[in-house]
Amino acid sequence: MSNVTPMMQQYLKIKSEYQDCLLFFRLGDFYEMFYEDAKEASRVLEITLTKRDAKKENPIPMCGVPYHSADSYIDTLVNNGYKVAICEQMEDPKQTKGMVRREVVRIVTPGTVMEQGGVDDKQNNYILSFVMNQPEIALSYCDVSTGELKVTHFNDEATLLNEITTINPNEVVINDNISDHLKRQINMVTETITVRETLSSEIYSVNQTEHKLMFQATQLLLDYIHHTQKRDLSHIEDVVQYAAIDYMKMDFYAKRNLELTESIRLKSKKGTLLWLMDETKTPMGARRLKQWIDRPLISKEQIEARLDIVDEFSAHFIERDTLRTYLNQVYDIERLVGRVSYGNVNARDLIQLKHSISEIPNIKALLNSMNQDTLVQVNQLEPLDDLLDILEQSLVEEPPISVKDGGLFKVGFNMQLDEYLEASKNGKTWLAELQAKERQRTGIKSLKISFNKVFGYFIEITRANLQNFEPSEFGYMRKQTLSNAERFITDELKEKEDIILGAEDKAIELEYQLFVQLREEVKKYTERLQQQAKIISELDCLQSFAEIAQKYNYTRPSFSENKTLELVESRHPVVERVMDYNDYVPNNCRLDNETFIYLITGPNMSGKSTYMRQVAIISIMAQMGAYVPCKEAVLPIFDQIFTRIGAADDLVSGKSTFMVEMLEAQKALTYATEDSLIIFDEIGRGTSTYDGLALAQAMIEYVAETSHAKTLFSTHYHELTTLDQALPSLKNVHVAANEYKGELIFLHKVKDGAVDDSYGIQVAKLADLPEKVISRAQVILSEFEASADKKSSISNLKMVENEPEINQENSNLSVEETTDTLSQKDFEQASFDLFENDQESEIELQIKNLNLSNMTPIEALVKLSELQNQLK
């Protein structure tokens, strides 16, 4: 370190304390980065990487950004998953002898962004923590920008992962005893995981819970927030305890497959349920809407209360339209309050706050004109006239962004400020008069009096006017020479400059002091403002429900006591919106305690998946308290929705399409109850025909015999359609299609009974496969159909590439019964050598004796390899 400058020694010492951050090190008007930080930042920010001490043997990599525009650079880094430590100069270099003292004043992390441009107005920016003491788990999360703070607890990792998926945090804080396996699963939701080894001894306000583990989770979270922000955050609310079981459960797969808040293909909001339902007018309302979509209610009383309000708004179009106008004038009160508390609020923010609270009396008067019994839940608004008066009397209507350059306060707000401003104003009037007088005295009409921060006030004369001009004759003293002009000062101008600039400096300094006082005064209203923001956000959501109900002809759902689901002329709300409303084909659905499984057949592209999804989405909308796209809708209240839709490998976890399919199915079969909804689309297509058919039938039987969950099960295994003979709870339906002159016409209508044709080749023709392929497929299909024995297995058919499907007449038989219908030769071909006799083979015994519960995946793979080698 002997050859390192004192400044770099200071840098290295501070950097050693923040090794997981990029250090923004303040040097004058720049934030500089060095060494690996500089290399990383220059790459991400696409700025020039240079060198410090370039002529030395080991120059230091360096890059920098201007401090006045640093926010955009910080946002870019944070959005790419980095943490940024802001190191400021704590002393004025002009007044300090030796090294300027520097400190990290804040760490910006993905979960603690407070700047207005750094967070999406319509998205919460959550940071989450959890602690485990098996089998108990406690989870706490916070949006630092709004102050929201919640905590819960449960007893299984499945609920933990569901909650993390629902909350969708940008950062997760954990202690150091969390397994690597669980970390990898969390990484699928968020890339930023912070490990905190110890907890602070400081006790934060978690007075609403006595649960020790929940206290620890909340303390871990708040400890980290205060460690990174390094200041008082009075806007963070008292922690609210909630229970995950109070809401409908949907795991990551269900939310993805149903495209509730993000589309699968484009990874965007457009084309999702959130996109459809968002007729909100405020950022707070938009965030609340997403929360409601993520957490549908299971309390009938709470659902009906929301629906009653939607009823009221639906019945009063003029009042609703007026309310939307008022809400459109309301800014993001939650985040404005957050910035007040944090200390980075500016005068324009406070003007936005003023305009927002000025609408509260209008909204309250409007609600008072409607049904008070219905609106009691949302008519708790409290006009903040005292705060409104403070803001109205203090700030000018259009203040500058900076709070340190003056121009913030109205004349008359502060007597001392008025005196300074008057002195400055009079001085500028005097300057204008002096300029006119000097022009007349010198005869130079282009003479002007100007100002800059380096030289102060000066008289400027262009070089063309200096040829016959003698400055000393007029008392001018040369101040600065330019290429095309000379600048002068006079004793009189210098004397007046001291008065003017003294007044301006004092005015600016006083204005900043007054603004800080105003900010602290506004901070006293934090709790009241947050309560108003919560009510306004709920109002905004409910008027949005009424707006889409009227716009798209939705109806109020009702809820059955006997767990019946009956949808009359139901539609998929998103698909309907993106296509012509009049072209959409509505469909019915009825599931009850006797018939709770629909087995759905029909050709590809006919609308099977859309039909199943719309039942799930309608159920979610109903339990949010919204109207639904149906002519009539009677629903049970579902506790959970499970889906198995589409085909996608999980490359991150190394899982194949079929493994993902089985994992999704496993969750449904394990956790579904009679109050659940299951959507299974084409189960078994990721494996061979026999395996897929066997698994599909076994799953249907399991649901029928065990959970009795309402189930929509689409399939191309036509052999399954005979299951209705053995399972009274199963009903066959199909999505109709007609073939006309060799062309396939999709009717998109769900009808009773099974379909008798998959129309696979016709669909391939629609996809414009080469004609040669289509023709060859038709020939092969004809050969299959001609050689198929109606009373035996299709294993006698000549197969091309893939195995054909089992004949429909044998589809109601078990795998064992099916093999009985084969010839001996066919049976030998279809059977495994392991099971050719009744004696247990050595390999079977080895498999039977494996202790799977104590084997790691790697050990299991090694053992499987050994068994495979024995068979070779």
From Swiss-Prot:
The keyword Membrane does not apply. One of its GO terms (molecular function) is damaged DNA binding. It comes from the Bacteria. CDD domains: ABC_MutS1 (cd03284). Transmembrane segments: none annotated. Pfam families: MutS_I, MutS_II, MutS_III, MutS_IV, MutS_V. The keyword Hydrolase does not apply. Keywords: ATP-binding, DNA damage, DNA repair, DNA-binding, Nucleotide-binding. ATP binds at residues 602-609. GO terms for biological process: mismatch repair. InterPro entries: DNA_mismatch_repair_MutS (IPR005748), DNA_mismatch_repair_MutS-lik_N (IPR007695), DNA_mismatch_repair_MutS/MSH (IPR017261), DNA_mismatch_repair_MutS_C (IPR000432), DNA_mismatch_repair_MutS_clamp (IPR007861), DNA_mismatch_repair_MutS_core (IPR007696), DNA_mismatch_repair_MutS_N (IPR016151), DNA_mismatch_repair_MutS_sf (IPR036187). SUPFAM superfamilies: DNA repair protein MutS, domain I, DNA repair protein MutS, domain II, DNA repair protein MutS, domain III, P-loop containing nucleoside triphosphate hydrolases. GO terms for cellular component: cytosol. This protein is involved in the repair of mismatches in DNA. It is possible that it carries out the mismatch recognition step. This protein has a weak ATPase activity. Belongs to the DNA mismatch repair MutS family. This is DNA mismatch repair protein MutS. The lineage of its organism: Bacteria, Bacillati, Bacillota, Bacilli, Bacillales.
